[in-house]
Amino acid sequence: MPSFKLASWNVEYADRTLSDLEVPDGPSAWKRRNAERKIDAIAAEISELDADILFVCEGPRGEERALKYFARAAPGYELVTRNDPTGKEYGTLGIQWLWFLVKRSFRIAAAITPSLLPLATWRAFTETESDGRTKDGKWLVALPTFDKTTGLAGASELVRHSHYRHPQTLVFDFKGRRIEIIGVHLKSKFVDQTDPQKKWVPPASPAFDDIAAAMKASPGFITEAVKARAKTSSEATDVRTYIDRRFAQEPAPAIFMLGDVNDGPGKELIEDWFLVHDLIGNLQGDVFFAKKFLNHALFDFPDALRWSVQFEDELDPRRHPNILLDHILFTQALTGDAAWPLRVKGGAGKVEHDIHERVNSLLPKSIATSDHRPVSVVVTDVSVGPG
C-alpha cells in the first residue's frame, strides 16, 4: 500500500438531512424526497472522493444518528466512535458533530486499529502545557461587553470559555509510528443577530471610509463579532497548546490537523482594527520555532483554485467571495527526506472542485450536497519503496 488519501468535508447540516429522511407521507413528504436525493448525492461525492480516512464536519448529533446517516452516505466506511450512547464523551454542543470515517478496506490493508483520543487525555495535556491556565477543559478569555443603555461598547471582562465543539483526535499506529489526526470545526455563531441594537448597518458603498462608518454605526454588532473571534481564537490556541505538549513529549510527533476553520465575517477588518490573530496563524505556531511549525497541504495548490466556499462578506464587500475555510495542516515529521514511514510530498494537497461540481451539476441548488468543497491530501508510505 504505497499511499493513502486523507480528506476533510463539511457536509452541511447532516442532522437536518437525517430528520428530513424520516418525514412521513403527507403534505411535507417533499422534504423526504429532497433529503433522499441529497444524501444519495453525498454518497456519490464521498464515493468519488475515495478517501481512505474522511473527517466530516456538521455530521449528525450522537452515535446512533451518525451510524444511521453514514450507513447510507458512506457505505464501505467504518464510523470511529467512543461507544458512548449519551454523547457526553464527545464534548460537543449543538447538532453539528465531528466524525471520522475509515474505509474498511484501508483499515484491513494497513492493519491499523483507529480510535479516538479520550478528552481527559487532551485536557490533561493542555493543562500541563499551559501551566494551569487551562483546567478541566476551560480557560479564561477577555471578552468585550456592550452597554445596551448607552449603546456603546464597554470594558472587557474575563470569562471562562471552553470548546463549543471539542476537537476529535483520531489515533492509530502505522508501522510502529503513532499517527494523530486532529479534527476541528471552529465557527463564529453571532451573525444572525435578532437584537436591533446588535444589527449590522450595511456600508453605503465598498469604499473603506463607508465601511469604517458602518462599523462605527454598529457598535453592538462589532462587539459581538470581536467577542466571537476572541472565543474561537482561544479555542484555536487550546488546539495549539495540545500540539505543543506533544512536542514536549517527543521531538517530532506525526500530527495532522484538519477541518473547517471559519474566522467569521470581516476577517481582515477585525484583525486590523482589533489586533486579533487569524485562526490558522494560531494553529500553525511560531515560525521562529520552525520544527514545531505546521505545514499547509494546500500551500502549493494553484492560487486561483485555493478556496473551498463562496461567501459574500457582509462586513467587508471588498473581500473576494472565494474563501479557503477548510484546511489540512501537518507537522514537519511528515515532510522532507527524513519523514518515515509516512511523507506528504509536494503537490499532494487538493481542493476537490471537479468532483464537487460534477456531482452537484445533477442537483438543483436548493439540495446541493454542501456549500463546502472537500479538501484532501495524499500521504505516501515511503517504507515500501523509494520516497
Predicted segments — roles?
Residues 11, 59, 186, 260-261:
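Active-site metal-binding loops of divalent metal-dependent hydrolases
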Residues 21-25, 70-73, 197-198, 270-278:
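Short secondary-structure boundary/capping segments
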